[in-house]
Amino acid sequence: MAKVHPNIRVPDQPCITSIASQQQEPPVVLTVWRKSLLFNCHGFTVFDANGNLAFRVDCYASSTRRAEVVLMDVAGKPLLTIRRKRLSLADSWVIYDGDGATTPLLSVRRHVGLRASKALAHVTPLSSSLPLPDAYVVEGSYGRRSCAVRDARGEAVAEVRRKESVGDDVFRLVAEPRLGAPLAMGIVIAIDEMFRGGGGGSSARSLLRRTCSD
């Protein structure tokens, strides 16, 4: 990780839909640190390729069954609200734009099945403003720090990759422009909330299970 402390300048954050529509740009590579920069607070601190602060998540609640997590920009402005769906047969979360007051963007539902499967969760777009296919599947192993969000053709639109020699609290998140870095991070947060209890075998162990519970 090039830097721990962010630059003072607050970068402009493009809207979610414009990020998702920029399909000709290279992937965004982020470094995710399982720690909040705020004292006595748990969460994520996310850096861009230059070591500048890109996103943050600050969790004050220590509950293992949180109802809501907010992804913020450098200045603390809500970019996405990840909210648990009530009365769902499977563990399901909905990702909303901004402070979560109106626009649902994606649904992330935990995979449930009797047969062994590489699938951990299913992601479904909920907004026509997102130029995305009908569905994604999250596959891989959190225990190995290796998982991917794949489209119907099996192509990865986001990947969690192990970052060597820095311990388990730091990893890479690679996001393709058609999904966008904020939505990719939102999916990671939802997956973490589903699996941080450690249930479901080795493939279901949460890579980030200590993020908001250490």
Where are these regions (language model features)?
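Classical protein tyrosine phosphatase
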Residues: E68-R84, A90-G98
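Low-complexity or membrane-interfacial segments used for flexible interactions
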Residues: M1-R66, V74-K77, A90, T103-D214
